[in-house]
């Protein structure tokens, strides 16, 4: 199926199977809907999977010292061939670099603020980005370790589900066009900025409205004035400059914040 071919491709690109006959991997999970399918196909490939699932119920775990300690212990005890995550986690990239263990990840969201972290530059990374624009922006920071790889689907699971539905269910759910995905309202970071000034809010609203009239061209970043950037930073958003790749404040504001606002507006 599509997904098993792509997972196999990921492993070959990353490791080249240099005489490896036994594979043990650490799968750091946070609750992505893509994780169960990836996990099932890792198992189908005969890979022994150690799952770290604390973040399933503690969403702040990856930013805590406890996470560093837990990953350190797991890497020391199990010595996995590689660590895998859906999306990119800087803390895992750091720990894998320290232990000289390969870190594989596959993005399923865009934008991802964590990709702006300098840890994407480690040679132990194998970062697969599903969005071409995302790939074109980040690949120069680690050209030998960042790859473009579109999303895949578990065709077998979906075919099985389709075969099992009743005639009435088919009538209820058959449409010419379907949208399955997040509305982004639950993950829009601008909603959390209670102290955003009227000037900044109006500026963002005008960009959002303009973007709805133009298809196929992303002009957000070039539309941000220096004055707006400084005004936006007054919300006390933390841009840890020593951890950012180059000067990416403008890109982060454009895509991580305003981009989410546009996505929510478009989908609702």
Put a short name on every predicted segment.
Residues 1-22:
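Short, Lys/Arg-enriched N-terminal segments with co-localized hydrophobic residues
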Residues 1-4, 47, 125, 170:
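Generic secretory/membrane-interface signal
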């Amino acid at each position: 199926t599509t997904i098993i071919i792509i997972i196999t491709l990921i492993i070959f690109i990353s490791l080249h199977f240099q005489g490896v006959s036994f594979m043990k991997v650490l799968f750091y999970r946070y609750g992505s809907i893509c994780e169960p399918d990836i996990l099932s196909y890792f198992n189908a490939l005969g890979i022994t999977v150690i799952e770290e699932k604390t973040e399933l119920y503690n969403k702040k775990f990856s930013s805590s010292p406890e996470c560093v300690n837990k990953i350190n212990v797991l890497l020391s005890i199990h010595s996995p061939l590689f660590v895998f995550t859906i999306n990119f986690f800087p803390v895992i990239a750091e720990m894998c670099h320290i232990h000289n263990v390969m870190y594989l990840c596959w993005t399923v969201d865009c934008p991802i603020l964590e990709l702006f972290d300098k840890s994407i530059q480690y040679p132990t990374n194998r970062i697969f980005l599903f969005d071409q624009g995302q790939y074109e922006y980040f690949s120069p920071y680690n050209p030998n370790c960042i790859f473009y790889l579109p999303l895949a689907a578990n065709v077998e699971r979906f075919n099985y589900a389709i075969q099992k539905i009743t005639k009435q269910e088919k009538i209820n759910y058959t449409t010419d066009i379907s949208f399955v995905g997040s509305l982004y309202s639950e993950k829009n970071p601008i909603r959390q900025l209670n102290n955003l000034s009227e000037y900044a809010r109006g500026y963002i609203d005008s960009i959002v409205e303009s973007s709805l009239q133009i298809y196929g061209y992303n002009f957000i970043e070039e539309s941000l004035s220096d004055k707006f950037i400084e005004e936006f930073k007054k919300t006390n958003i933390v841009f840890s400059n020593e951890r950012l790749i180059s000067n990416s404040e403008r890109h982060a504001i454009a895509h991580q914040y305003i981009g989410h606002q546009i996505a929510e507006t478009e989908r609702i």
